[in-house]
């Protein structure tokens, strides 16, 4: 009588062991280029193609291929001969470390830029 109960209990334990969740796969750290490509696509879509009035006076230049390993996007004044960037968003390393700097980051728009860039770098493509 005990042997059948022990066998049933062992079978049950074996089945429970088979049901345990598998550990999540390790997430590969994103390279600077991967992150900046994602940020560039979302910035283009959300800031410029959407006609967002906050970015109407700017245009974006992307410099994703870089020998320095620091891909970046630049915002410059639209229609101006002055090509100095007003905003630089760049990443470096794996995992990517982001920076945003320039005169625009001293304006009220800086909070939105920071929030958008962080959201896009983390994988979302939502505009805001």
In which residue ranges do the predicted regions lie?
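Short, intrinsically disordered, charge-biased short linear motifs at domain edges
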Residues: 4-6, 29-34, 112-115
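Extracytoplasmic/periplasmic, Sec-exported soluble proteins
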Residues: 27-38, 105-109
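Sec-dependent bacterial lipoprotein signal peptides
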Residues: 1-19
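Mid-chain, structured segments of secreted extracytoplasmic proteins
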Residues: 69-104
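C-terminal partner/receptor-binding element of secreted or periplasmic proteins
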Residues: 41, 97, 103-128
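Post-signal-peptide N-terminal segment of Sec-exported extracytoplasmic proteins
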Residues: 33-74
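Bacterial Sec signal peptide processing site at the extreme N-terminus
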Residues: 13-34
């Amino acid at each position: 009588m005990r042997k059948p109960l022990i066998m049933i209990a062992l079978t049950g334990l074996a089945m429970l062991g088979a049901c345990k969740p598998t550990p999540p796969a390790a997430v590969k750290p994103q390279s600077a280029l991967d992150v900046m490509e994602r940020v560039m696509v979302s910035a283009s879509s959300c800031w410029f193609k959407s006609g967002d009035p906050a970015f109407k006076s700017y245009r974006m230049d992307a410099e994703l291929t870089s020998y320095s390993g620091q891909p970046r996007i630049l915002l410059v004044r639209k229609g101006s001969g002055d090509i100095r960037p007003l905003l630089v968003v760049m990443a470096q390393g794996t995992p990517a470390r982001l920076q945003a700097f320039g005169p625009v980051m001293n304006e009220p728009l800086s909070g939105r830029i920071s929030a958008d860039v962080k959201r896009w770098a983390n994988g979302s493509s939502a505009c805001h």
